[in-house]
């Protein structure tokens, strides 16, 4: 069975990624289970951070590595929180504090448009010169009051007008079909299943 190390310790992300890669028979292991600490994310773009995380995990384990960097970008805030989404309210990181800061930042704003952005990077080995890079988005609006118990991050405040509900009200299956990460991973799964890239095998 093929094996990939996931360059994240975020439980929500790990659950989504494991579920979507399962049909390919790929064994997903977390970097923390292999004693690998999280990489720094010093860059100002999502793709640079994802590349840094994937390379760190692959070099440390000798396995192919999959990393994503994602966040929420709000039109009225000129794209913020962006790459700082996970630490928008500072340390210690907290979804509740991040959401509170976002709602406060949008107080009095009529433009509530926002989108989740995700970039996924697959490295076949630590020195892979041609990483697979896939991007996708998920558009919605920010609402002041949280609704729903599911998801993570900004999901309770991310309203989907076409569905009349927030991301936190979706089942895991629904979310995987339409979310930024779900769509990007689905494209990666299709690419791997069609052998459009080098097979994912341990090196």
From Swiss-Prot:
SUPFAM superfamilies assigned: ITPase-like
Annotated binding of Mg(2+), by residue: 40, 69
InterPro entries in UniProt: dITP/XTP_pyrophosphatase, ITPase-like_fam, RdgB/HAM1
Family to which this protein belongs: Belongs to the HAM1 NTPase family.
Superkingdom assignment: Bacteria
GO cellular component: cytosol
Pfam families, alphabetized: Ham1p_like
Keyword Metal-binding: yes
Keyword presence, Acetylation: no
Record-linked HAMAP family: Non_canon_purine_NTPase (MF_01405)
Cofactor comment text: Binds 1 Mg(2+) ion per subunit.
GO terms for biological process, alphabetical: nucleotide metabolic process; purine nucleoside triphosphate catabolic process
Binding of substrate, residues: 8-13, 70, 152-155, 175, 180-181
The protein's name: dITP/XTP pyrophosphatase
EC number of this enzyme: 3.6.1.66
GO terms of molecular function: dITP diphosphatase activity; ITP diphosphatase activity; metal ion binding; nucleotide binding; ribonucleoside triphosphate phosphatase activity; XTP diphosphatase activity
Role played: Pyrophosphatase that catalyzes the hydrolysis of nucleoside triphosphates to their monophosphate derivatives, with a high preference for the non-canonical purine nucleotides XTP (xanthosine triphosphate), dITP (deoxyinosine triphosphate) and ITP. Seems to function as a house-cleaning enzyme that removes non-canonical purine nucleotides from the nucleotide pool, thus preventing their incorporation into DNA/RNA and avoiding chromosomal lesions.
Cofactor names: Mg(2+)
Reaction(s) this enzyme catalyzes, per UniProt: XTP + H2O = XMP + diphosphate + H(+); dITP + H2O = dIMP + diphosphate + H(+); ITP + H2O = IMP + diphosphate + H(+)
């Amino acid at each position: 069975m093929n094996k990939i190390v996931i360059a994240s310790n975020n439980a929500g992300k790990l659950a989504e990624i494991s579920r979507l890669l399962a049909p390919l028979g790929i064994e997903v292991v977390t970097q923390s289970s292999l004693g690998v600490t999280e990489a720094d994310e010093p860059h100002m773009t999502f793709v640079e951070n994802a590349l840094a995380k994937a390379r760190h995990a692959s070099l440390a384990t000798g396995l192919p590595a999959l990393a994503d960097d994602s966040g929420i970008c709000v039109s009225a805030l000129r794209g913020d929180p962006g790459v700082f989404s996970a630490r928008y309210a500072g340390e210690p990181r907290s979804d509740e504090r991040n959401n509170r800061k976002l709602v406060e930042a949008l107080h009095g704003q009529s433009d509530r448009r926002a989108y989740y952005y995700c970039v996924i990077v697959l490295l076949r080995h630590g020195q892979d010169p041609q990483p697979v890079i896939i991007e996708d988005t998920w558009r919605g609006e920010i609402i002041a009051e949280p609704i729903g118990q599911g998801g993570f991050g900004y999901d309770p405040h991310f309203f989907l007008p076409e569905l009349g509900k927030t991301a936190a009200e979706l089942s895991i299956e629904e979310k995987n079909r339409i979310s930024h990460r779900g769509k990007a991973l689905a494209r990666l799964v299709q690419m791997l299943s069609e052998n459009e890239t080098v097979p994912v095998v341990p090196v």
